[in-house]
Amino acid sequence: MTIKQLHESDRPREKMIRLGARCLTDAELLAILIGSGNDRQTAIQLAQEILAKMDNSLPRLAKCDIQELTGSFRGMGPAKAVTVMAAMELSRRIPSQEMPRRESITDSRMAYRTISPFLTDLPQEEMWVLLLNQSGKIISMENLSRGGVSETSADVRLIMHKAVSHLASAIILAHNHPSGTVRPSEQDIQLTQRVQKAATLLGFRLNDHLIIGDDGAYFSFADEGLL
């Protein structure tokens, strides 16, 4: 059975137009993104299979990459996978835009709220820097690297260059641990110390270094008295 063979009231697109997005199940919303199923399943059935394999967890789905989706599910080609990943990325960015960019970052919680949408539910490790003016307001947020702190730790000069080129008075580092744990590694500690030393020499501050984990957990070097 195809979606077109379903009663109109049960078709996800028509149901969304009639009742609104909130009345649809996760599988129905995902089916709209997928668009079509395969020779054995409707789009809804394919969406249900995908969610079941993800333990019905949208954060788990958000951690997938295109290769995982296309390689694990019949009928999921690159175009469908890209559409799903694009929707996941848009939802990830919403919280960061709800906080005014000109609001001063005064504590670790505000810094976390600003940067976490870019570092949550990622399959790989990434390092970002928040560049702040004298009032603690964001000048820019920059992605420094993807792949791990071991690679990033060699890029202290890049961090300093970005701070100087943006005339920043302070910076906040942030990276994620895909494992979900927020305990700093020895590499994390060494990188923080190197950046703090370099920042002091150049006349600006390292206000914090955040490690982003799962379920809203984070570690703040500033809160723990490590700066």
UniProtKB/Swiss-Prot annotation:
Residues 104-227 form the MPN domain. SUPFAM superfamilies: JAB1/MPN domain (SSF102712). GO terms for biological process: proteolysis. Pfam families: RadC, UPF0758_N. Zn(2+) binds at H175, H177, D188. Signal peptide: none annotated. Keywords: Hydrolase, Metal-binding, Metalloprotease, Protease, Zinc. InterPro entries: MPN, RadC_JAB, UPF0758, UPF0758_CS, UPF0758_N. The keyword Metal-binding applies. The keyword Protease applies. One of its GO terms (molecular function) is metal ion binding. A motif (JAMM motif) lies at residues 175-188. Belongs to the UPF0758 family. NCBIfam families: PRK00024.1, radc. This is UPF0758 protein PG_0894.
